[in-house]
Amino acid sequence: MTTDSYPKKYDIVIVGAGPVGILLSLCMSRWGYKVKHIDNRPVPTATGRADGIQPRSTEILRNLGLKRKIMAYDPAKVYDVSFWDPRPDGSGIMRTGNWPSCPRFIDTRYPFTTLVHQGKIETVFLDEIKKAGTTVERPWTIIGFKNDGLDATYPVQVQLKCLDTNVVETVRAKYLFSGEGARSFVREQLGIQIRHKDPISYVWGVMDGVVRTDFPDIQTKCTIHSDAGSIMVIPREDDMVRLYVQIASSSDPDFNPRKTATAEEVQNVAKKILKPYYIEWDRVEWYSVYPIGQGISEKYTLDERVFMGGDACHTHSPKAGQGMNTAFHDALNMAWKLHAVESGLAQRSILSTYETERKNIAETLLDFDNKYAALFSKRRPNAGEVGEAATAETGRSAEEDPFVKTFKDSCEFTSGYGVAYLPNIFNWDPSHPAKSPLFDVPGINLVTGKAFTPSTVTRLADSNFVHLEQEIPANGAFRIFIFAGRQSRSKKAIADFAANLEKERSFLSAYRRSDIGEISFFERHNPHSKLFTLCLIYAEKKNDIDMDSIPQILRDYRYHIYSDDIPDVRVPNATYAAHEKLGFDPEKGGVVVTRPDSHIACTVQLAEGSGTVDALNAYFGSFSTKPLGQEQASRL
């Protein structure tokens, strides 16, 4: 049975409602796009699957307005990781080390891993997706697609089938996105191969349940090696614990990738591994056995109309807890770039950066996955190294101990804050051949391609202490943070900056809102353009800032004018902590552009004259659909 011959048209069809699909669906739905979202499961995830939210992902969830709802489930929070190994006398296991899962050298407000099962996370997303006007249709699957170009605006034809009724629906879309998981129909139809980086594969038994035990670290993340085997312990919400038990490895003489084990067999293995401690199960909520091989898709897209993300592109072991987190980052990267193109800001060619950025991160993830396994199974750190690594500051010594360096790099990467996109059209580092000498602020502590550093400031509109990196929600807009330094020193530079923003072909004027005449007085983030939000931060005490001397175009962002007057323990001697932590001279200031995903795009010196806005025009003009930088006056 098929539907009528006039196919409905969508901006995007999303297949799969796992982590990558739901975050992409939420962003696209909230940002005004028509989304067709299907999943082949009759109901959302009830138990099991991914459960670890890393610190940077928590930051993203807060930026999406979801963190509070997820925390309402009272999830377990892992601040510490313990390592257990065999006792020398063979009498069982002993703790050989423990350290923070997110050490102090990582600047985050969330120095912990949040653990709650995927079904609850999905529920939060699905509720918000529905509020934004999209419903995930179940149980539907994809049975065919082609980019036939018969409709220039909606070039992708997609065939979908309801698994309950066998109804087949044909739709047209601008884009098709596969978030189907490791067994992706879309990837298979495109003929894209998974390249296995590591020939070693594993079979794991995974069990969620409520246990009784005298093992002292049951509420802590643990990696346990014993003469009877290896286990990973992950605390969960509602008094549950997740146990990962390695059942088989391809290094075993009789390795069978289809090897299985019953829940009772895995429990018996766990009991042997944990000796001299006992463990008993009150109940088992979920149990599964699955093979793990490290693989990465050779391509994420062939035509920049049909894309893939999440497990459809990369698979790895559960040790580092990265699957869902990497999927979230894939989705956000995809979402803001599609929005940049479809909103008319960016040329279509920028979509190629989705694959180059995210595939590079997946490659790095698999490399770290290998290091993680080697680090904890082949070499035991001594107590001195553990303490040194956990307290070390970044960049301390060029001759760091290999273990300390690997530990730091691993923690930073797995936290999400080690993700660094390489230089490209969006990420301008000092190697970029930009003509303006104002790019790159001397002494800046921000790294292009990495997430914006947290800082706390006072919002002048209501005197609230706020987290600057969270002040602009994930709305698809670029963020321009103007660190204005001392007001008396920067007054002319700010006046010139504002005057040049007013020009007709400034980035702000060229993409001003079509409804700017009707815009609400209460519009917080986008009074001029839906594609940019400006923030102004002065190195002054709150009551010393003269609002009347701030140009009107910047005063329009009245909810985004701040005083840098809150101390920061990371720069205890700083008078103006946000400026100084980020590396700005409090007298001179500077400008930071972050992408809609909060990664650093570029930094620019704040100078008198047109130079600062000229530099920003050059940056945005490198990918914009309109010429930027002409000299006519604007009506903003």
From Swiss-Prot:
Keywords, comma-separated and alphabetical: FAD, Flavoprotein, Glycoprotein, Membrane, Monooxygenase, Oxidoreductase, Transmembrane, Transmembrane helix
Function summary: FAD-dependent monooxygenase; part of the benzoic acid degradation pathway also known as the protocatechuic acid pathway. Benzoic acid debradation begins with the conversion of benzoic acid into 4-hydroxybenzoic acid through hydroxylation by the benzoate-4-monooxygenase bphA, and its partner NADPH-cytochrome P450 reductase cprA which act as a mediator in electron donation from NADPH. 4-Hydroxybenzoic acid is then converted into 3,4-dihydroxybenzoic acid (also called protocatechuic acid) by the p-hydroxybenzoate-m-hydroxylase phhA.
Q: Which residues are glycosylated?
A: 573
Sequence similarity? Belongs to the PheA/TfdB FAD monooxygenase family.
Q: Which GO terms describe its biological process?
A: biosynthetic process
Q: Which organism is it from?
A: Emericella nidulans (strain FGSC A4 / ATCC 38163 / CBS 112.46 / NRRL 194 / M139) (Aspergillus nidulans)
Q: Write one Gene Ontology MF term.
A: oxidoreductase activity, acting on paired donors, with incorporation or reduction of molecular oxygen, NAD(P)H as one donor, and incorporation of one atom of oxygen
What is this entry's stated membrane topology? Single-pass membrane protein
Provide the reaction this enzyme catalyses. Answer: 4-hydroxybenzoate + NADH + O2 + H(+) = 3,4-dihydroxybenzoate + NAD(+) + H2O; 4-hydroxybenzoate + NADPH + O2 + H(+) = 3,4-dihydroxybenzoate + NADP(+) + H2O
Q: What SUPFAM superfamilies does the database record attribute to this sequence?
A: FAD-linked reductases, C-terminal domain, FAD/NAD(P)-binding domain, Thioredoxin-like
Q: How is the cofactor bound?
A: Binds 1 FAD per subunit.
What cofactor does this protein call for?
Answer: FAD
Q: Which Gene3D superfamilies match?
A: 3.40.30.20, D-Amino Acid Oxidase, subunit A, domain 2, FAD/NAD(P)-binding domain
What is the induction comment? Answer: Expression is largely up-regulated in the presence of benzoate.
Q: What class of enzyme is it?
A: oxidoreductase
Q: Which Pfam families match?
A: FAD_binding_3 (PF01494), Phe_hydrox_dim (PF07976)
Binding positions for FAD? Answer: 11-40, 242-244, 290, 311
Task: Give the location in the cell.
Answer: Membrane
The regions listed as transmembrane in this protein's record are: 12-33
Protein name stated in the entry: p-hydroxybenzoate-m-hydroxylase
GO-annotated cellular components: membrane
EC annotation from Swiss-Prot or TrEMBL: 1.14.13.33
